[in-house]
């Protein structure tokens, strides 16, 4: 598989009431095809959030945004553009980071969370020097992280509830 230069095509989802910010790396091939975050049907992000928040699993983009806004959750990614093979985070190179300061200036974000180790490492390298706000790295909800069962993910991700 060849490297492809990808530029992030989604706006961040947040408003002035957002209390936590969850950052991924970059939308996957499937997410870009579906025009929204965590669009791969095997990605457990939406199912996990719905479970933790005692909500129905959202199906449409509007339902997903509604659940985020209702629960004061902002989402975006750490990468504005990069070179990547398919959806493989391990292949990411030539990163141009997003500027999350616009979210932090608008919303009273209590905690930043990284969805997976790669997002956490990139946040630490690029955004932490700009924000001074440490991120908590959580296990990835990606289907590539099959070693983590849904139950284990739920246990690890319950910590987001403390800041909501």
How does the language model describe each region?
Residues 30-91:
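Short, surface-exposed acidic-centric catalytic microdomains
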Residues 19-25:
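Short, hydrophobic/glycine-enriched beta-strand segments
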């Amino acid at each position: 598989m060849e490297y492809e230069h990808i530029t992030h095509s989604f706006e961040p989802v947040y408003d002035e009431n957002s209390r936590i910010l969850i950052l991924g790396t970059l939308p996957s091939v499937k997410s870009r095809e579906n025009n929204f975050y965590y669009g791969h049907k095997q990605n457990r992000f939406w199912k996990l959030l719905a479970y933790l928040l005692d909500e129905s699993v959202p199906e449409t983009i509007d339902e997903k945004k509604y659940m985020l806004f209702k629960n004061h959750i902002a989402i975006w990614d750490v990468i504005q553009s990069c070179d990547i093979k398919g959806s493989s985070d391990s292949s990411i190179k030539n990163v141009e980071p997003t500027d999350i300061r616009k979210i932090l200036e608008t919303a009273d974000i209590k905690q930043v969370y990284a969805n997976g180790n790669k997002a956490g490492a990139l946040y630490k390298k690029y955004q932490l020097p700009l924000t001074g706000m440490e991120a908590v790295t959580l296990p990835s909800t990606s289907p590539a992280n099959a070693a983590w069962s849904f139950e284990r993910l739920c246990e690890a991700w319950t910590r987001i509830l403390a800041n909501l």
